[in-house]
UniProtKB/Swiss-Prot annotation:
Its EC number is 1.14.15.33. Substrate binds at residues 94, 187-191, 238-246. Changing residue 50 to N: Increases affinity for narbomycin and YC-17. Mildly increases activity YC-17 and narbomycin. Heme binds at residue 354. Its cofactor is heme. It catalyses: narbomycin + 2 reduced [2Fe-2S]-[ferredoxin] + O2 + 2 H(+) = pikromycin + 2 oxidized [2Fe-2S]-[ferredoxin] + H2O; narbomycin + 2 reduced [2Fe-2S]-[ferredoxin] + O2 + 2 H(+) = neopikromycin + 2 oxidized [2Fe-2S]-[ferredoxin] + H2O; narbomycin + 4 reduced [2Fe-2S]-[ferredoxin] + 2 O2 + 4 H(+) = novapikromycin + 4 oxidized [2Fe-2S]-[ferredoxin] + 2 H2O; 10-deoxymethymycin + 2 reduced [2Fe-2S]-[ferredoxin] + O2 + 2 H(+) = methymycin + 2 oxidized [2Fe-2S]-[ferredoxin] + H2O. Changing residue 94 to Q: Strongly reduces affinity for narbomycin and YC-17. Strongly reduces activity with narbomycin and YC-17. GO terms for biological process: macrolide biosynthetic process. PANTHER family: CYTOCHROME P450 YJIB-RELATED, P450, PUTATIVE (EUROFUNG)-RELATED. This is Cytochrome P450 monooxygenase PikC. The gene is pikC. GO terms for molecular function: heme binding; iron ion binding; monooxygenase activity; oxidoreductase activity, acting on paired donors, with incorporation or reduction of molecular oxygen. It comes from Streptomyces venezuelae.
Length: 416
């Protein structure tokens, strides 16, 4: 998506992140650290060609995430949305209060820790089936993205929302096209196709007694449009599906990459699985699935330590750098599953804190436990330097994660 600002006055120099290539995609942390040393806010050009502001450093990141002067509503942006984007942006993630409050309240109860815990048996069943299929590979090798990291969260969120099984593969194509775009036109086409599909899915649920979340939202909209308009219904379906799986895909894959790249930490976790919850939190901090929080737009000029961000400009808060700020996380480049990660921002901060965090954590914990318990000597099947990272400044994700394990009597046994 093009996010070049319109109508701003003289701007500071622009750092072209795209020119840094795969080196930056694979390891953006030194660049972010250099920027942080120079100040909290910087103009950059993303690999897509968008000119935006990056906010770096833990304290500034946390403050901006909770600052009401930074709007999430595109009506406060100087950059117009395309028709395809506008059709899908009527959702809680891209709204400010009171609209945000109203929309979030409609779905919040479905994602409480108590409600999510009720999904544990089904999530375990899905994980067991996927790991069974993966371990059936005759050569003891697989791409973890394809075998587990992607199919688990798309299955869980699709069942929760009532997306038919035959339709789910299309979401991989659509989300890859606009989350990791190679071609802007292709991204717009994907958004239009997803919008059309979701509109048809919503229509198919009208007048039915479905027990899924999307059916419940359809009934709410039909009964009282003041609580949920038809445009908001479409936007909510979109954000729940995309945010409901994309983050968890990369949490599982990035987390397992971090674990497999640090044999001492892998051994420590295998020896004491009570460390699992803390390990997942360290995965979120060390190599989290969200590199930068989604777009924000100042409603007035905002001065960050002497750098003024004009009203309407696009701002990305770099969570990845917040988590590598040594004043907040000592020795931040060390992966340590016993670390105190309290205060990490992987799921955001403030009113837009990720509503699906309990579900993402549940899926990741079950997936990691299953892999370690059922694959005796799970390992990367390539060197870390051979892995390819997507050049997206918001989503931190791998194109593939090749793994291998020992074939033998011990491999593959379910322990639960």
């Amino acid at each position: 998506m093009r996010r070049t600002q319109q109508g701003t006055t003289a701007s500071p120099p622009v750092l072209d992140l795209g020119a840094l290539g795969q080196d930056f995609a694979a390891d953006p942390y030194p660049t972010y650290a250099r920027l942080r040393a120079e100040g909290p806010a910087h103009r950059v050009r993303t690999p897509e060609g968008d000119e935006v502001w990056l906010v770096v450093g833990y304290d500034r990141a946390r403050a901006v995430l909770a600052d009401p002067r930074f709007s999430k509503d595109w009506r406060n942006s100087t950059t117009p949305l395309t028709e395809a984007e506008a059709a899908l942006n009527h959702n809680m993630l891209e709204s400010d209060p009171p609209r945000h409050t109203r929309l979030r309240k409609l779905v919040a109860r479905e994602f409480t820790m108590r409600r999510v815990e009720l999904l544990r048996p089904r999530v375990q069943e899905i994980v067991d089936g996927l790991v069974d299929a993966m371990l059936a590979a005759p050569d003891g090798r697989a791409d973890l993205m394809e075998s587990l990291a992607w199919p688990l969260p798309i299955t869980v969120i699709s069942e929760l929302l009532g997306v038919p099984e035959p339709d789910r593969a299309a979401f991989r194509v659509w989300t890859d096209a606009f989350v990791f775009p190679d071609d802007p036109a292709q991204a717009q086409t994907a958004m239009a196709e997803m919008s059309g599909y979701l509109s048809r899915l919503i229509d198919s649920k009208r007048g039915q007694d479905g027990e899924d979340l999307l059916s419940a939202l359809v009934r709410t909209s039909d009964e009282d449009g003041s609580r949920l308009t038809s445009e908001e219904l479409l936007g909510m379906a979109h954000i729940l599906l995309v945010a409901g799986h994309e983050t968890t895909v990369n949490l599982i894959a990035n987390g397992m990459y971090a674990l497999l790249s640090h044999p001492d930490q892998l051994a420590a976790l295998r020896a004491d699985m009570t460390l699992l919850d803390g390990a997942v939190e360290e995965m979120l901090r060390y190599e989290g699935p969200v590199e930068s929080a989604t777009y924000r737009f100042p409603v007035e000029p905002v001065d960050l330590d002497g750098t003024v961000i004009p009203a309407g400009d696009t701002v990305l808060v770099v969570l990845a750098d917040a988590h590598r700020t040594p004043e907040r996380f000592p020795d931040p480049h060390r992966f340590d599953i016993r670390r105190d990660t309290a205060g990490h921002l992987a799921f955001g901060h403030g009113i837009h804190f990720c509503i699906g965090a309990p579900l993402a954590r549940l899926e990741a914990r079950i997936a990691v436990r299953a892999l370690l318990e059922r694959c005796p000597d799970l390992a990367l099947d390539v060197s870390p330097g051979e892995l390819v990272w997507y050049p997206n400044p918001m989503i931190r994700g791998l194109k593939a994660l090749p793994i291998r394990w020992r074939r033998g009597r011990e491999a593959g046994r379910r322990t639960g």
